[in-house]
Amino acid sequence: MIKYKNMKNIIKKFKSIWWAIKLFATRIHYGNPSKKLKVVGVTGTNGKTTTATLLHKITTALGHKSGLIGTVEILIGEEKFKADSNKPMPSTTPDSVSLTKIFAKMLTAGCEYVFMEVSSHALDQNRVSGVNFAGGIFTNLTHDHLDYHKDIENYFRAKKKFFEILPEKAFALSNADDEHGLAMVERRRCPAL
């Protein structure tokens, strides 16, 4: 039996390569539907579900068809998204392959807007890579999820990454009442409120 010193790194790289191939194949089939939608991501420790849901409901009430991706449910207009299996969604923010499929279904259904929760885990694991965001919203940052991030600095960096990847034409909205609010939107390419 051959033993490699860095077997964990080799496996991690293989998984990354395999994931990239899977995403590439998905994009060949579906294209990048997020480019044809106005996708607004909401990140923060608390308030993601409420904020995304309210934006979805308000936009729908104004006569625009929108989608919602979050912890509680995924909605395409007012219809609940039917996953490929009967299992519930495993995380707040689905992986990039699943997101591409969901965005494609939303686009086919006539959605103009998508409001989605963007978790720190998703940002750290690059689950929103390639999503063309029209805007990003920061709610707050508290000392939750430190089991995953180890300390508040790592948690902050994971959330901040979201605002650094927003395109120039997007917008950033940050809660200035939160002690991390102003720092969260530094080093961004888009306008911030």
Describe the role of every protein-language-model region:
Residues 42, 69, 99, 117, ...:
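Residue-level signal for inorganic ion chemistry
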Residues 66, 113-114, 191-192:
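Hydrophobic anchor at the start of a short beta-strand
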Residues 121-129:
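Conserved helix/coil segment N-terminal to the catalytic DExD/H
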Residues 76-80, 84-86, 144-149:
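A short acidic, helix-capping loop that chelates divalent metal ions and anchors anionic groups
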Residues 63-77, 119:
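Short beta-strand-centered segment that lines the nucleotide-binding/catalytic pocket of NTP-utilizing
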